[in-house]
Amino acid sequence: YEQIGEKIEDTKALGGVQILIQGGHNPYIPFEWYLDLLRYIKTHHPIHIHGFSPSEVDFFSTRFRMDATEVIRELKAAGLDSIPGGGGEILVQRVRDIAAPKKAGADRWLEIMELAHNAGMKTSVTMMYGIGETLAERLEHLQRVRDLQARTNGFTAFITWPLQPENTPTMSHMPKTDATTYLRTVAISRIVLDNVPNLQSSWVTMGMKVGQMALKFGCNDFGSLMIEENVVSAANTTHRTTTDELDRLIVDAGFTPARRRQDYTIISSNDGLSIAAPALSATAAA
């Protein structure tokens, strides 16, 4: 816990306003350990905690024989503020059976998101494409997200990115998709998901210039400036930036940079010449 606390204080010292907690499915760590972690953070290092994707909630539910509603309630009571959209991949069971057979199924993933929304928690939602799905199945994924949002209005943002096949043993045979496909996917997502207020650009996977172009294809959020990231980088994809560079790219695209919180309330905005304090989130606001 203390090591995590040190990382949080480093984040706050740089102007950070939230942390993301995600991990593997470790059967040897008791559920109470996660609850104590949340309590520890809120007591000693208060910050917005965005954590525990539907896949992890499903794992907790199965491993500890708890209803998913109870898992979410316990996590929220301990200090969890919002839930990330990790593990969404493609929300079509045929694809998941091939690409991620041990993760929560498509229906279960959506069910857990709906339970979280009904519990008063906001979440993000994702789509990782290029894992063997058809174009029709990508659209089915988007439609299922749109349908759930119509019922709950609980999604704050949608983020899409392509599979990074390098160093991903089970998917290393898949071809890497190009920038054109990414920008088309962003544009189609913006049209279909007219009830999801924000689309986040994935410069982490696509690089800064393509990330900037995505602002013209439907994204209004340039994403976060991350202090530490271990998932995409493990797949041998590494792009680094600074707040000044994010600021400049947003201005050059014709937008005004702003710092935001997880719920998209604006902390501060400026003319793009500089950001007063180092920010971990940069949003392009029209």
Where are these regions (language model features)?
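Auxiliary Fe-S-binding modules of radical SAM enzymes
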Residues: 12, 143, 149-286
